[in-house]
Amino acid sequence: MKLRQLDMELFGGCNYSCSMCPQGSEKGRERDFKKALSWLNFMKIVDDAELHGVESISLHGGGEPTMNKYFIPAIKYIKNKNIQCTTLSNGYNLDDNLIDEIIDSKIDIFKISVVGYDEQTYEKMMRTNAFNKVRENVKNLVRQTEGTNTRVQSQHLILDPEKKDYEVEQLRKNWIDYTGIDAEIWLMHNWSGVYEGKYERSKEDRRGCGRPFQPMLQVRAGGLGKHQGAVVACCMVLGNDAAATLGHLDDQTIEEVYNGEKYQELRDAHKEERFDDIP
């Protein structure tokens, strides 16, 4: 089998508790999935992915990757295999020392997640009074990576679709122009389930996304029980990882999971449009 992309979580916990994320919900993220991926399991998974011709590995998931002590060694391990490497962070830990290490790692793309267009909305959504701190961290990262292999990007979410134009204007003024960063702006995600109506999916008009048939895998740092490296259906199952687990790469190969019974059941349910049969 050919594997094009591997999304791999290094750390299942987080130093933030954002309102739109299960990390910040009353229930919180499932305990089994808040682990740090071990170095041995990380190497096993990357080596296996390399055998399947993986083109890109993104170190992100539902936690903060910089909290894994092997964050920089993980990037270097991937880059030494000539595989594209990307990560997504909240940017809080980007001090001068980490920035130097990031540049030295030669990571291809470093993405920053920022929800909120000013100090007040950032604190409301990300539940941390760190808008200015992160903004300065990222401005420094952008400046120091100029002329290097590393591209720095930010990802933002619209808080109120009715005020989209205003929010884009504020993001441009308070964030994009200030830091000099390239940015993506998306509609709000609702992983935590705390928002009403606007993003509900109609049960009368459903279709498969096609992800179960794509040459890509979504891997969590944690797993059921003592396992690590759980393969889940997609990134949108965050908060329900246990029900979405298709196998574990700490004691299975990528091919065993991808061609396994649970993965095939998921594909069959999509093909036959039996969406209520999907946990």
What feature does the model see in each segment?
Residues 1-9, 175, 179-279:
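Accessory C-terminal segments flanking Radical SAM cores
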Residues 1-109, 120, 124-128, 132, ...:
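Conserved alpha-helical substructure of the radical SAM core
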Residues 7-9, 22, 58-59, 87-89, ...:
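Short beta-strand segments
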Residues 79, 146, 176-177:
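Anion (oxyanion) recognition and catalysis
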Residues 85, 138-166:
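Conserved strand-turn element in the central/C-terminal portion of the radical SAM core barrel
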Residues 90-94, 116, 159-162, 189:
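Short beta->alpha connector loops
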Residues 98-100, 161-175:
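Catalytic cores of alpha/beta
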Residues 102, 107-118, 183-189:
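Non-cysteine beta-strand/loop elements that form the S-adenosyl-L-methionine
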